């Protein structure tokens, strides 16, 4: 009888990526097939996130539900992974002794051995270590699930922002070798993937080892990925302003595969608050990056992250954040009220902004960004947009849905053979969270680019300095 696996995932796209890898891994090693119903499962995995408030209590609440399933099925294996597990491993083991396996983001590749240990009679297994980049060497080959795919290029973060737990839960920055990244993407392209999203806590800090002992920068990696035949769209998330260097901006100038949409977290518009957050940049420096980007990509849309009510944030500080939002004209945001994360420096700061004030500031901020997003959407009315068709629409299964380069969802009437391909759609209606349109051109009528070798793409902008060292410019 086929054994079943249920995974519940909270948090960022890195967690979603990790969960998909866990599913692929356990299918290949134990024949475990995914199920949406936890009561059907032989193995239950909870992939946790510590970003949101009361993350630990949310974990124990979920585990309490699964405890009843364990009572009815003593052979059920329960595992907790992700950032809360990394932070609170021993606490979880003591408070929820019925949990069999506790693993961190960097040890998910060891799940098969852990499950075998539990089934062999061991009472519990805890492994929340940071074994560098080992996990990527132990995962099965990538499996495409549609025309878009996420690919992790690095793990961890060295920035140690005062509010953030990531360096403590995922470790410091470690980049995957460039050949490994390119090979994974090439495999996905062969399976029909047309758009790839490069993932990392701080992707623009990527410094990938090459086969000849050199280091590949993030800008160089972007050009190499763009050269892979079949990959027509390239995204990345998330990045840090202090490492958004000019060579990355140059890629926007000369690489059309890189989309005109960027998520670049700023967190606040007040230099005083940014200093307390240890962000290592000013609001002016952030605006300078955006100005340079728009000089080479006038149509680029920018999204960001904001934390309101950080300890010590005054009404004037918040007003400076609102000014930055207006000046940059953000298209969307992920915005949160501040709440302390145990073990972070900010947790020791006096949390002197009232909850009511935090909520009010969040409402004002989100309303402003929603207004700006609505203006962008209205400007798209009557325009033609290139859409990558992802599948049937959630609103109407008789229609298709896809995304524009600027990450707008578009629903339209079309035929099944369009799925996985590009279509040009004329926008006819604008809604709060989506657009509607009519197909005016199919992929066969577009004349998309001809295949180029990686070296041809790199040579487009390669120049040598006075020492004969290659540099890449627009």
From Swiss-Prot:
Catalytic activity: N(6)-dimethylallyladenosine(37) in tRNA + (sulfur carrier)-SH + AH2 + 2 S-adenosyl-L-methionine = 2-methylsulfanyl-N(6)-dimethylallyladenosine(37) in tRNA + (sulfur carrier)-H + 5'-deoxyadenosine + L-methionine + A + S-adenosyl-L-homocysteine + 2 H(+)
GO cellular component term, pick one: cytosol
Residues annotated for [4Fe-4S] cluster 1 binding in this entry: 12, 49, 83
The Radical SAM core domain, residue ranges: 143-375
Cofactor(s) listed: [4Fe-4S] cluster
Residue numbers binding [4Fe-4S] cluster 2: 157, 161, 164
Pfam families: Radical_SAM, TRAM, UPF0004
Top enzyme category: transferase
MF (Gene Ontology): 4 iron, 4 sulfur cluster binding; metal ion binding; N6-isopentenyladenosine methylthiotransferase activity
Subcellular location: Cytoplasm
Main location (coarse class): cytoplasm
Subunit structure, as described in the record: Monomer.
Protein name according to UniProt: tRNA-2-methylthio-N(6)-dimethylallyladenosine synthase
Species whose genome carries this gene: Haemophilus influenzae (strain ATCC 51907 / DSM 11121 / KW20 / Rd)
